[in-house]
Design a protein with these regions (language model features):
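Beta-strand secondary-structure signal
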Residues: 40-44, 87, 121-123, 178-180, ...
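Sec-dependent bacterial lipoprotein signal peptides
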Residues: 1-24
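Bacterial Sec-dependent N-terminal signal peptides
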Residues: 18-54, 346, 352
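Structured interaction patches on ligand/partner-binding surfaces of diverse proteins
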Residues: 105-107, 129-178, 298-329
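Short coil/turn motif common to extracellular beta-sandwich-like domains
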Residues: 33-46, 69-74, 185-189
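Compositionally biased low-complexity segments at domain edges in trafficked proteins
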Residues: 151-202, 322-354
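Tryptophan-paired
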Residues: 71-136, 203-315, 349-354
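Structural motif
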Residues: 45-80, 193-203
Length: 354
């Protein structure tokens, strides 16, 4: 080894508990310094979720096993301890000095790289490459690094599970060091299961179309501070699960979390134009789903589902509901209330799916 310089290797091991382990190696030699030391970083992608509990409590307890299996299959590529790609940034000060993006697609990955000896703030993110609704912006500066949801009055939900971590690293000279960094999920999912064979209507309700939207969720995430922003309040068009069981409809939206309290939720901008027609909704609600059912005669029934429980990062909430013959939706869940508008709005301004 030449005097004044040592090889620096960084071990970046992403431990994925549900996947087989594999390794990949990369050497990065840009921006080297004569002051360097050996250190390692172990990355753990950790999912703390209540998905299985929600499915068991809300669906399987009602013998909705086919719905439960279909829903779990639909969400399996989002709610999992897995990193398709990682984005790694190191900041000796406000501005970034080193950055690496790497496609992983494995349960475990090891990187060898060289960095100057220094005090670093390290930000790590996973699964950004395939996420079309969220961008990483201003990541050149540690305090501004931001997961920004695309701007729009109506947007689609996220299609990947997003994980982030942040940690201070004091890289010393002539000392072998190892750091443990855990990445946690920052998005969540709200799910609506609708039965169209309500009590007394075993043949099922006749309707032409059903569309579901969600609102009152965060629009971004400050990576360094680990805080969510609510600068705007976009409406998210829920995804409809295809080929549901007979007389069932399944919708979900993967988003950033909601506010924590009704008081915070009441301060959000209300961007849905149709809300002005009916005035304010429940004051104790934290987030909402809007259900638009088009009946065979063309009339539209709108139901606002007001949810009183916060939806946090990594979590899911399943709302089990029923459709009445007039197209209205009701749920036995005590944590939700509904507001119904029959023959809602001439000149419907929503996507009808037709």
């Amino acid at each position: 080894m030449r005097s004044g310089k040592r090889i620096i290797s960084v071990l970046a091991a992403v431990v994925l508990m549900m996947l087989p382990a594999g390794c990949d190696f990369m050497r990065i030699t840009e921006d080297l310094s004569d002051c360097a030391t050996l250190f390692s970083v172990k990355y753990n992608v950790t999912l703390r979720t209540n998905l299985t509990t929600q499915v068991q409590t809300v669906l399987r307890s009602r013998f909705e096993n086919e719905v439960a299996d279909l829903l779990e299959d639909s969400l399996k590529n989002i709610f999992r301890e897995y990193a398709h790609d990682v984005d790694l940034s190191f900041y000796p000060g406000e501005e970034r000095s080193f950055h690496d993006s790497h496609i992983m697609d494995a349960g475990q990955a090891t990187y060898s790289l060289e960095l100057p000896v220094n005090d670093y703030r390290h930000l790590a993110l996973a699964n950004l490459a395939d996420e079309v609704e969220v961008d990483l912006t201003q990541s050149q500066w540690v305090q501004r690094s931001y997961l920004s949801q695309i701007v729009g009055d109506t947007i689609q939900g996220h299609n990947t599970g997003l994980f982030t971590a942040r940690q201070d690293m004091n890289i010393l000279g002539n000392v072998d060091q190892e750091f443990d960094v855990t990445l946690y999920m920052v998005n969540c999912a709200s799910i609506l299961v609708i039965r169209t064979d309500s009590v007394g209507y075993s043949q099922g309700v006749a309707y032409r179309d059903c569309q579901v939207y969600s609102s009152d969720f965060a629009d971004g995430f400050m990576v360094n501070d680990s805080t969510f922003t609510h600068r705007t309040n976009p409406t998210v068009h829920d995804f409809r699960v295809t080929n549901p069981p007979v007389k069932r409809e399944i919708y979900y939206a993967v988003t950033f979390p909601s506010c924590d309290t009704p008081e915070e939720a009441q301060t959000l901008p209300d961007t849905r134009a149709d809300n002005s027609q009916t005035g304010s909704t429940e004051e104790d609600r934290i987030w909402r789903k809007y259900v638009y059912v088009t009946l065979p005669n063309g009339d539209v029934t709108r139901t606002i589902i007001n949810v009183k429980m916060p939806l946090q990062a990594g979590q899911v909430m399943i709302i089990y509901a029923y459709m009445r013959p007039d197209g209205s939706i009701y749920s036995p869940n005590v944590e939700v209330s509904t507001s119904v508008s029959l023959k809602w709005k001439d000149g419907l301004d929503i996507e009808t799916g037709e």
